[in-house]
Amino acid sequence: KMCGVTQNWESYESTKKASQLNLTPEQQRFPQRYIKLGIFVDHGMYTKYSGNSERITKRVHQMINNINMMCRALNIVTTLSLLEIWSEKDLITVQASAPTTLTLFGAWRETVLLNRTSHDHAQLLTATIFNGNVIGRAPVGGMCDPKRSVAIVRDHNAIVFVVAVTMTHEMGHNLGNHHDEDKCNCNTCIMSKVLSRQPSKYFSECSKDYYQTFLTNHNFQCILNAPLRTDTVSTPVSGNELLEAGEDCDCGSPANPCCDAATCKLRPGAQCGEGLCCDQCRFTSAGTECRAARSECDIAESCAGQSADCPTDDFHRNGQPCLNNHGYCYNGNCPIMFYQCIALFGSNATVGQDGCFDANDIGHKYFHCRKDNEKYIPCAPQDVKCGRLFCTYIYDIDLCRYDDSANGMVAQGTKCADGKVCNSNRQCADVNTAY
């Protein structure tokens, strides 16, 4: 059984509070992110479980708990914000062709679903047996995109954990991860191309590096902020590091001095149980920095003194010059090709010569600006620096190195000319109208 993704595979430091002391070094490596999941159960899966919606709901809740456990190594909290069971009929045509079904599901999310509910990433669970022994598929790097922040997963095993690994795998693709190669020294990890008989609950070091590159090149707003308690629909689970409906605090251990583990209610005299602005069960004083600025495009946030939560992550306006006019601010980062080359090829890399980028007007699998209905659209001459990124090393004979994965494209918001940046359509557009 395998994943259907077929591409070639190639911080900020927050103030540490009592509630964060249990973070592993891996979690401290990545900034906190939150993914609100929408799960859709197709009619075939509804029929598979004899129309027992309660059984399906319980199974999905268990899947979400497993996904959340696996994503902790990336410092990601996942919550179930929407569960929809297609009990009467499918709302899209679910086919044996995984690519076709994924395309239809993405289009439905963009045109129908987002008009009626808010979430970050949607997955379709199905009983359909896909061609080629495929059990899941998702676009690489599609997180937060209206059409591409989706995945399809076959409910292929009676064991909840095994299916949850596949769901995490596909969400990993959306977060910029590719399949683990032999050099990753982990043929059973979450991003392995083929699901093993005993899949691991761990991400490989390769996956962590890919995710770190993804965060370096992108700063998608949809996963920056914690959901409200009213945004979650799963049964409250104590110790999942998130406040859900019915909880005053997320206690976890009975030894928590702020929170009663039996009731998930605050102990007498406690103002809070966790949060960046909670210290020893009390609100941190107003003005205490709770989230440092991670770049000159970001804004540091401070506690208000009346809440345990750090204010919403904010940043300077998009288009503000940064890094000595080498770039323009975009969603709190200053994306420039130089740092993207370093992220892809190491500290000795630099941007390739201008002539390298002319290859992007070919309309090839690797050299293009956009993809439309499986057709690669060449870049217009003025847009070639918004397609594939070209890098080189100092004194390197290869002046036009490139990474043929999704991460090898020039990041949105990157400066492509004076007063211009790459927009979401991979056009080199005026910085005043590009966002």
UniProtKB/Swiss-Prot annotation:
Its cofactor is Zn(2+). Signal peptide: none annotated. The active site is at E170. Residues 1-26, 228-243 form a propeptide. GO terms for molecular function: metal ion binding; metalloendopeptidase activity; toxin activity. Binds 1 zinc ion per subunit. Residues 33-227 form the Peptidase M12B domain. The modification Pyrrolidone carboxylic acid is found at Q27. Residues 235-318 form the Disintegrin domain. Negative results: the metalloproteinase does not bind von Willebrand factor (vWF). Disintegrin: inhibits platelet aggregation induced by ADP, thrombin, platelet-activating factor and collagen. Acts by inhibiting fibrinogen interaction with platelet receptors GPIIb/GPIIIa (ITGA2B/ITGB3). Belongs to the venom metalloproteinase (M12B) family. P-III subfamily. P-IIIb sub-subfamily. PANTHER family: ADAM A DISINTEGRIN AND METALLOPROTEASE DOMAIN, DISINTEGRIN AND METALLOPROTEINASE DOMAIN-CONTAINING PROTEIN 28. This is Zinc metalloproteinase/disintegrin.
